[in-house]
């Protein structure tokens, strides 16, 4: 029912290479209540994403060494140096912008996303990911983070969407994709087929929800 201390609870926690602990009911931020236990995996994408990231870390812990071809397919990991530099620049730009716009409303998400310093930051992170072959900016920290994000993406997203959003605009990502697909097939797992199914089932679930209008 609960793992962690009074002040720091872990809704999903990997213990070493072989144990994965899930609080149930799960309290991961954004997770949904269980209404259909059989199909909950295909409905709660937030919880599923978190679980696959943890499983990715557990898989890496079992490897004797990182996948050399995969690592060589993108830029070298830098322990987050480049990503954190972008974050520091964002903080400076945000501070300067707010000094010029003291009455700005941070509660208006659409307006916040149109601010120049936000657009600049998002574009810079996107470029970091395209050039390095990463899925997220944080993936540039280490092989573990990079592999985990790729695993989560492949097992939960369709090839059509992955190609459009990640492969067509980045040769390093396209190369890493092919390497991982081959890697998992050597273990008898067509991971992209799993991702295609997840996207199909998740879309069915979303379509079944009442309209918000």
Regions found by a protein language model. Give the residues of each.
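Active-site-flanking segments in enzyme catalytic domains
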Residues: 2-213
